[in-house]
Design a protein with these regions (language model features):
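Peptidoglycan glycan-strand catalytic modules in the bacterial/periplasmic cell-wall system
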Residues: 1-170, 179, 186, 333, ...
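Acidic/histidine-enriched alpha-helical segments
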Residues: 13, 49, 88-90, 94, ...
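Conserved catalytic neighborhood of penicillin-recognizing serine enzymes
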Residues: 1-6, 58-61, 125-143, 366-427, ...
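Active-site loop and adjoining helix of the penicillin-binding protein/serine DD-peptidase-beta-lactamase fold
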Residues: 15, 19, 23, 75-93, ...
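Bacterial peptidoglycan biogenesis and beta-lactam-recognition machinery
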Residues: 23-28, 40-45, 59-61, 99-113, ...
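A penicillin-recognizing enzyme superfamily signal
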Residues: 201, 205-221, 252-319, 324, ...
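Extracytoplasmic
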Residues: 13-17, 26-29, 34-36, 43, ...
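Non-catalytic structural connector segments
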Residues: 108-202, 206-270
Length: 637
């Protein structure tokens, strides 16, 4: 844009040359079409199609004459003739366009007079990335595509993990930083807002809707009211009753200092006392509720406590072979809870880590049929201190049990037994090989119980190896990108890696199916899920994190549910454990998917194991006999 007369003088001849070239290659209709498809009609409406939806809630072909004239009138100066802000001014401009149409013979005198007499009526529906379907996914995709090349000096000391992850993504993920890596013909970077790019994502709109509906049904309609009721009358609410009041006040004050209101008041020179007084003064505000936004009066400090009371969630579903991400939910509502718990946030994974431990065991010669005595296990930790994990399962105490039984029942003593036979460093290496980027996973003996933090997306990607013969596939969010003319600019293929042997993968499949059919994951069957599947629940200390990972031959999906902070949680496992808080979301989603025949998913689909495959081959029974033939049914029935 020319900023002064001299620049304008130089710009004019260039425009003349461009105009002549355009006229040579395109008709006037084509030129107008290209112009309207790129014009910014304000209010996030770039292009005539988006503008028609934004201002009149219809397709361009369905615009009435006076509506089309309104949009054309905006082209002279969209800010000056903005129909939302300046209705009468925009109406006047519309009538000028109608008059020009009359002069050109597109409408009759009578039509012109009648149309000019009409009021300007809008069906305004602003396009907002914070609303609609797949909001967390859209924002995640925007951040990935517009990411700049990582420069270490741009990251603070506590952001070195992020710098590490961003650097890997820049080098290995062609979608990461796409706008910075790809140039237009004029040498400038692409702009995802104004260049009319067509981005073809892997998200299935119906499956996405089913995922969001499942979250609302379980989290919004059932679990959240139960949580509110549990916290009624507690001075600490929403924090745990056992937490000292002083600690609760510290946490709320910390949250206050992270708000924009606090930052702006601080920048304006307000004292801590003045800021606190403002935060303790009631005011009108609109707040989130699962039944819709509600107007209320409360202090900003109370609003912080109010929003802390809402349980958060992360959910992702993907194809284990193609890597196509079908559904992506990062939280309850993007407008009010913008931190993405699908791909960005990490939480302790609890017992969902145990399949990695058992995989390491299978890779080191163990089999699902190997047995050990079900008793307490004591290991020496990294500090030379004895460590004995607690166990919620005292069934079959003192008996010989199989590893398959141990995983199916998520037994901590059996996990500790395996950890004693293996090496924590090797377990960390294996977890990283499954695509987990968190460098802060400590090689300690307690790692077998899942104290490390991993994202839902990383977990879902990792579990694809169990459904895909030992091959892990990275999440694929976009298949191709085209320019505004339909020219393909980039295509994206699945990124796959064999992380474990096919034999170990089959053995893990056998055990993870047993979690559902014989163990603690059986609750999923109550939802009408009869499919051949494997899975694993997870619950961390004090019910701070609830997990469920489940997979069928065609879909791998994972769900996490928890509070905004670890000290915000259910007091009872009845509601806070993975099988109660996270598993139902997975099950509700899958039931909706299976009930939609147009999606093509069938509960009759089975995992395919090689003919004659014996997961017990090479295993030793208590009397030392080596099992060479027969399968699990021979041993466990």
């Amino acid at each position: 844009v020319a900023r002064n007369t001299l620049q304008r003088l130089f710009q004019k001849p260039i425009e003349w040359v461009i105009a002549v070239k355009l006229e040579r290659y395109y008709t006037k209709e084509e030129i107008l079409s290209m112009y309207l498809n790129k014009f910014d009609f304000l209010n996030n409406a770039v292009g005539i199609k988006t503008a028609a939806h934004t201002y009149f809630a219809c397709e361009p072909k369905d615009l009435k004459i006076e509506e089309a004239a309104t949009l054309v009138g905006m082209c002279k100066n969209p800010s000056l003739y903005n129909p939302v802000r300046f209705n009468e001014r925009s109406r006047g401009r519309r009538n000028v366009v109608l008059e020009q149409m009359r002069k050109a013979g597109y409408i009759t005198d009578a039509e012109c007079d009648s149309l000019q007499a009409l009021p300007l009526k809008l069906k305004y529906n602003r396009v907002d990335h914070k609303e609609g379907l797949a909001t967390y996914f859209r924002e995640y995709l925007r951040g990935v595509m517009t990411a700049p090349k990582p420069v270490k000096s741009d990251y603070r000391g506590w952001q070195m993990q992020k710098f590490y992850e961003d650097s890997i993504a820049w080098e290995t993920n062609p979608l990461y930083g796409w706008c910075a890596k790809n140039k237009k013909k004029d040498g400038t970077n692409y702009n995802i807002y104004t260049d009319g790019l067509k981005i073809y994502t892997t998200i299935n709109s119906r499956m996405q809707q089913y995922a969001e509906d499942a979250v609302k049904e379980h989290l919004g309609d059932y679990l959240q009211p139960v949580f509110f009721k549990e916290k009624e009358g507690s001075k600490n609410a929403p924090y745990a009753r056992s937490l000292p009041e002083k600690r609760v006040e510290e946490l709320l004050t910390k949250a206050m200092k992270q708000t924009d209101r606090y930052r702006l008041m601080k920048e304006a020179g307000a004292s801590e006392q003045q800021i606190r007084k403002a935060f303790d003064t009631p005011e009108e505000m609109t707040v989130f509720s699962w039944k819709g936004d509600k107007d209320t009066i409360m202090t900003p400090m109370d609003s912080i406590r109010y929003y802390k009371s809402f349980l958060r969630t992360g959910f992702m579903s993907m194809d284990p072979v193609s890597g196509h991400v079908k559904a992506y939910v990062g939280g309850p509502n993007y407008v009010y809870f913008q931190y993405d718990m699908a791909m960005v946030g990490r939480r302790q994974v609890g017992s969902t880590i145990k399949p990695y431990l058992y995989t390491l065991a299978m890779e080191n010669g163990f089999s699902p049929c190997d047995q050990t005595r079900h008793v307490e296990q004591t290991l020496i930790d990294e500090n030379g201190t004895p460590w004995t994990p607690r166990n919620a399962n005292n069934k079959r105490y003192g008996e010989m049990v199989t590893l398959k039984w141990g995983l199916a029942n998520s037994d901590n003593w059996i996990s500790a037994y395996l950890m004693g036979k293996l090496n924590p460093y090797n377990l960390v290496r294996l977890i990283h090989s499954f695509g987990v980027r968190n460098k802060a996973i400590d090689p300690v003996v307690s790692l077998c119980l899942g104290p490390c933090e991993i994202s839902v997306g990383e977990m879902v990607s990792a579990y694809t190896a169990f459904a895909n013969k030992g091959i892990r596939v990275a999440p694929l969010f976009v298949t191709r990108i085209e320019d505004s003319d339909g020219n393909v600019l980039s295509t994206f293929a699945p990124q796959m890696e064999e992380v474990i042997s096919i034999s170990s993968a089959y053995k893990m499949l056998v055990m993870l199916r047993a979690v559902i059919n014989e163990g603690i994951g059986g609750r999923v069957r109550r939802y009408g899920i009869t499919a051949d599947m494997g899975g694993k629940t997870g619950t961390t200390n004090d019910n701070s994190d609830a997990w469920f990972m489940g997979f069928t031959p065609s879909l791998v999906s994972g769900c996490w549910v928890g509070g905004d902070e670890r000290d915000i949680h259910f007091g009872r496992m009845t509601y806070g454990q993975g099988a109660a808080a996270a598993l139902p979301i997975w099950a509700l989603y899958m039931k909706k998917v299976y009930d939609d025949p147009t999606l093509g998913y069938d509960q009759q689909e089975k995992f395919k194991l090689p003919e004659g495959f014996d997961p017990c081959a090479g295993s030793e029974t208590p009397d030392g006999e080596v099992i060479e033939e027969g399968g699990l049914d021979d041993l466990f029935n």
